[in-house]
């Protein structure tokens, strides 16, 4: 397949003729300069900036302006259009709105202010699909943070983790993709949040919810993203649970396979009694009050195995639904 045919295959059904002619010109001008996926992202950014007035970081905006300088569709174009080479484009001035055929500057401005969202949203949803594909190809021996950095860089997207006390919020470009308040006993809430975001991207269909400026996975609001991810991960270990040991060691192994480490928390109560909690990923799996005679190491080990057996049976019964519920040792609980 030749260069022109390869680029022509990139046209989307929803693209207007003007937008496509500009994007095609951009892709042809830089066809030999970038990998295909990166060029697709850059060409859409060029359209977002040129036609929709979208704003990004200063560095990215300058890069797009430089790459797009001098690129415009010929008003009297033939079917093949008129393009400039990348080497020439970099020496020319950026295309102005007045250079584009159709409505006047004023009418274009009004239209741009009133209805940029449908095309912009479709474009961003498409980029989320590319982010999913990029994450799937990222080596899994990397940490969650390294995986996100690698994937977002390849898709020319920015992501940021904002932590205030135990509340974690993650944004991708200008949209919130994750939000959760962890309990004070969660060992590494940042790592939990990033791993959850990766699992959600890889397991769900992501789409922008414009009214709330959220990226929702399978339509779930971002405040419920963590609970739904934990629910999915528990469902994923069902096969291993059905074929393995229903003990603390066995359950710990199954949970580790889906990035959920299990810990045992003990809390002293009145007298000699204690409360034993099994917690994973800030989810309270099981809780039991121990009498004074049960507070020895051998007895607690036996009871922990019994509690693990109960959790395994719960997983096998397909009745798991995890919800936000701030407990003494967790921020999630079974409904």
From Swiss-Prot:
Among InterPro entries, the record links this protein to: XTBD (IPR021859)
Biological process GO terms, please? miRNA catabolic process; mRNA processing; negative regulation of miRNA-mediated gene silencing
| Entry annotated with the keyword Chloroplast | no
The UniProt keyword set, sorted, is: mRNA processing, Nucleus
Compartments it resides in: Nucleus, Nucleolus; Nucleus, Nucleoplasm
Q: Which residue intervals are annotated with compositional bias (Basic and acidic residues) in the record?
A: 105-114
GO cellular component terms listed in the entry, alphabetical order: nucleolus; nucleoplasm; nucleus
Q: What is the effect of changing residue 56 to A?
A: In xe29; lethal at 26 degrees Celsius at the L1 stage of larval development and abolishes xrn-2 binding
Q: Where is this region: Disordered?
A: 95-119
Question: Which residues belong to any copy of the XRN2-binding (XTBD) domain?
Answer: 7-91
Inactivation phenotype: At 26 degrees Celsius 80% of progeny arrest at the L1 stage of larval development. Reduced xrn-2 levels.
UniProt superkingdom: Eukaryota
The text the record gives for the protein's domains is: XTBD domain is necessary for interaction with xrn-2.
State the oligomer form and interacting partners. Answer: Interacts (via N-terminus) with xrn-2; the interaction is direct.
User: What function is annotated for this protein?
Assistant: Plays a role in maintenance of steady-state concentration and turnover of microRNAs (miRNA) by degradation of mature miRNA in complex with the exoribonuclease xrn-2. Stabilizes and enhances the accumulation and activity of the exoribonuclease xrn-2, and thus contributes to miRNA turnover.
- What protein name is recorded for this chain? Partner of xrn-2 protein 1
Q: Which organism is it from?
A: Caenorhabditis elegans
Please spell out the taxonomic lineage of the organism that makes this protein. Answer: Eukaryota, Metazoa, Ecdysozoa, Nematoda, Chromadorea
């Amino acid at each position: 397949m030749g260069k022109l045919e390869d680029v022509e295959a990139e046209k989307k059904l929803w693209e207007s003729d003007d937008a496509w002619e500009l994007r095609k010109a951009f892709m042809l001008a830089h066809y030999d300069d970038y990998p295909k996926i990166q060029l697709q992202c850059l060409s859409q950014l060029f359209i977002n900036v040129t036609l929709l007035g979208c704003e990004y970081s200063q560095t990215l905006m300058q890069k797009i302006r430089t790459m797009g300088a001098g690129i415009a569709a010929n008003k009297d174009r033939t079917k093949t259009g008129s393009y400039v080479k990348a080497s020439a484009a970099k020496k020319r001035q950026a295309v102005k709105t007045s250079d584009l055929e159709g409505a006047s500057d004023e009418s274009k401005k009004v239209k741009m202010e009133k209805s940029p969202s449908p095309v912009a949203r479709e474009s961003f949803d498409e980029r989320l699909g590319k982010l999913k594909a990029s994450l799937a190809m990222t080596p899994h021996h990397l940490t969650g943070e390294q995986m996100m950095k690698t994937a977002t860089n390849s898709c020319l997207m920015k992501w940021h983790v904002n932590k205030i006390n135990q509340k974690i919020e993650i944004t991708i470009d200008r949209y919130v993709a994750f939000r959760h308040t962890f309990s004070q006993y969660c060992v590494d809430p940042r790592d939990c949040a990033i791993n959850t975001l990766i699992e959600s991207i890889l397991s769900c269909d992501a789409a922008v919810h414009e009214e709330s400026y959220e990226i929702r996975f399978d339509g779930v609001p971002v405040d419920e993203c963590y609970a739904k991810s934990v629910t999915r991960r528990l469902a994923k270990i069902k096969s291993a649970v059905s074929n393995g040991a229903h003990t603390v060691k066995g359950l710990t192994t199954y949970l580790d396979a889906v990035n959920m480490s299990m810990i045992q928390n003990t809390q002293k109560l009145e007298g000699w009694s204690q409360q034993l909690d099994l917690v994973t990923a800030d989810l309270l799996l099981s809780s039991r009050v121990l009498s004074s005679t049960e507070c020895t190491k051998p007895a607690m080990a036996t009871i922990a195995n019994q509690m693990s057996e109960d959790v395994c049976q719960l997983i096998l019964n397909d009745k798991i639904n995890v919800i936000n519920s701030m407990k003494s040792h967790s921020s999630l609980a079974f409904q």
